[in-house]
């Protein structure tokens, strides 16, 4: 009933305005080191028992906090997602609740209905075509290894990393996704992130710090970059700069699953093309919401709620939990809590 009331409140506000072979399922780091040497077989904390992951895959995720599945999403699906994104850019479709983001270096006078103007769309839960990504059997089969059978799609994004303007604003600072999430436990949350084309260090691939998912949530804020920082691009304020990093070179359809405490980011896009990826954060429907007031997450709560009030009016009483309950969609099993 509480979920329905929260969703109804935001609806009113908005109204106002197939398993791969074992050889194909591997991680492909291109820098840094990874390890499973310290893993103790009797201790599985981050993966659940089923017949999808091999023992080696479970060990890898347990130790490193991420796992790359090669060639998981078919080309045909990726092309459909690309086509829908282009329609959104041309304003041919306007899904309810969608957030469209542009690079901080693009002035308002330059805005035009073009793929070149949009760096990311998120919250596409009302776009049937893009949201298909969150329901693909190929994706959910692996998601269930981390969340269990009752699965909620919590946060959706299609990222269109632009060529860097020279100010390095196409970078994404090192961060932990849990900073943005007012729900727990973290071990029952996972991100699926799929490359929509060849992704390398040249066009700004993901970089991860293996094993950092075993730590705690660190304080985040905007980094002090001379060229500016994009909206919501919070970064960790305190981390080991010399810690080993792994750059994930991926091909179209490759998908990385990673823990929300894993420290990760991405570099500049040094090419003239737009680097595309589509992703969804999934959580067990058995997770619960928390109050982030008085914690390191309070700054992102104030920012998100402030943006909601800006768009929907401060007279509408919307809190962070309402916003997340409105975004959340059941994709498998039963909606037991979230």
Swiss-Prot record:
Broadest EC class assigned to this enzyme: oxidoreductase
Organelle targeting peptide span: 1-30
Any GO MF annotation of the entry: phytanoyl-CoA dioxygenase activity
A Pfam short name: PhyH
Alphabetical list of SUPFAM superfamilies matching this protein: Clavaminate synthase-like (SSF51197)
Names of required cofactors: Fe cation; L-ascorbate; ATP; Mg(2+)
Keyword Oxidoreductase set for record: yes
Biological process according to GO: 2-oxobutyrate catabolic process; 2-oxoglutarate metabolic process; fatty acid alpha-oxidation; isoprenoid metabolic process; methyl-branched fatty acid metabolic process
Pathway: Lipid metabolism; fatty acid metabolism
Record-listed E.C. numbers: 1.14.11.18
Effect after changing residue 275 to W: In RD; total loss of activity
Catalysed transformations (reactions): phytanoyl-CoA + 2-oxoglutarate + O2 = 2-hydroxyphytanoyl-CoA + succinate + CO2; 3-methylhexadecanoyl-CoA + 2-oxoglutarate + O2 = 2-hydroxy-3-methylhexadecanoyl-CoA + succinate + CO2; hexadecanoyl-CoA + 2-oxoglutarate + O2 = 2-hydroxyhexadecanoyl-CoA + succinate + CO2; octanoyl-CoA + 2-oxoglutarate + O2 = 2-hydroxyoctanoyl-CoA + succinate + CO2
Keyword field: Cataract, Deafness, Dioxygenase, Disease variant, Ichthyosis, Iron, Metal-binding, Oxidoreductase, Peroxisome, Peroxisome biogenesis disorder, Phosphoprotein, Retinitis pigmentosa, Transit peptide, Vitamin C
In-chain residues carrying the UniProt-annotated modification Phosphoserine: 317
Location(s), subcellular: Peroxisome
Binding site for Fe cation: 175, 177, 264
Effect of residue 177 to G: In RD; total loss of activity
Modified positions (N6-succinyllysine) in chain numbering: 59, 108, 231, 252
Any one GO cellular component localisation term in the record: peroxisomal matrix
Tissue: Expressed in liver, kidney, and T-cells, but not in spleen, brain, heart, lung and skeletal muscle.
Function description: Catalyzes the 2-hydroxylation of not only racemic phytanoyl-CoA and the isomers of 3-methylhexadecanoyl-CoA, but also a variety of other mono-branched 3-methylacyl-CoA esters (with a chain length of at least seven carbon atoms) and straight-chain acyl-CoA esters (with a chain length longer than four carbon atoms). Does not hydroxylate long and very long straight chain acyl-CoAs or 2-methyl- and 4-methyl-branched acyl-CoAs.
Subunit structure: Interacts with FKBP52. Interacts with PHYHIP.
Family stated for the protein in its record: Belongs to the PhyH family.
Disorder cited: Refsum disease: A rare autosomal recessive peroxisomal disorder characterized by the accumulation of the branched-chain fatty acid, phytanic acid, in blood and tissues. Cardinal clinical features are retinitis pigmentosa, peripheral neuropathy, cerebellar ataxia, and elevated protein levels in the cerebrospinal fluid (CSF). Half of all patients exhibit generalized, mild to moderate ichthyosis resembling ichthyosis vulgaris. Less constant features are nerve deafness, anosmia, skeletal abnormalities, cataracts and cardiac impairment.
Protein name (record): Phytanoyl-CoA dioxygenase, peroxisomal
Origin species: Homo sapiens
């Amino acid at each position: 009933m509480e979920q329905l009331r929260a969703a109804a409140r935001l609806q009113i506000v908005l109204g106002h305005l197939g398993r791969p072979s074992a050889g194909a399922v591997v991680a492909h780091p291109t820098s840094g080191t990874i390890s499973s040497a310290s893993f103790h077989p009797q201790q599985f904390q981050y993966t659940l028992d089923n017949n999808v992951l091999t023992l080696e895959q479970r060990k890898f995720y347990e130790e490193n906090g991420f796992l790359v599945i090669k060639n998981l999403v078919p080309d045909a699906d990726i092309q459909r997602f690309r086509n829908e994104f282009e329609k959104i850019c041309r304003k041919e479709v306007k899904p309810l609740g969608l957030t469209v983001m542009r690079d901080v270096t693009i002035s308002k006078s330059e805005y035009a209905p073009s793929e070149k103007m949009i760096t990311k769309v998120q919250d596409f839960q009302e776009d049937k075509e893009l949201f298909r990504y969150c329901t693909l059997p190929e994706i959910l089969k692996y998601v269930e290894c981390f969340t269990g059978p009752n699965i909620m799609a919590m946060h959706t994004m299609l990222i269109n990393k632009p060529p860097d303007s020279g100010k390095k604003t196409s970078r994404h600072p090192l961060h932990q996704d849990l900073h943005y999430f007012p729900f727990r436990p973290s071990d029952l949350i996972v991100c699926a992130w799929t490359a929509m084309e060849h992704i390398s260090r040249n066009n700004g691939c993901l970089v991860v710090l293996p094993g950092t998912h075993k730590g705690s949530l660190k304080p985040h804020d905007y980094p002090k970059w001379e060229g500016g920082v994009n909206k919501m691009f919070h970064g960790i304020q305190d981390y080991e700069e010399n810690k080993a990093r792994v750059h994930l070179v991926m091909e179209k359809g490759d998908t990385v699953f990673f823990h929300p405490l894993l420290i990760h980011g991405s570099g500049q896009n040094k090419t003239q093309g737009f680097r595309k990826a589509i992703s969804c954060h999934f959580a067990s429907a058995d997770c619960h919401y928390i109050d982030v007031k008085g914690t390191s997450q309070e700054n992102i709560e104030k920012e998100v709620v402030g943006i909601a009030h800006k768009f929907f009016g401060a007279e509408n009483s919307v809190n962070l939990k309402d916003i997340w309950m409105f975004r959340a969609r059941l994709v498998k099993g039963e909606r037991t809590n979230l």
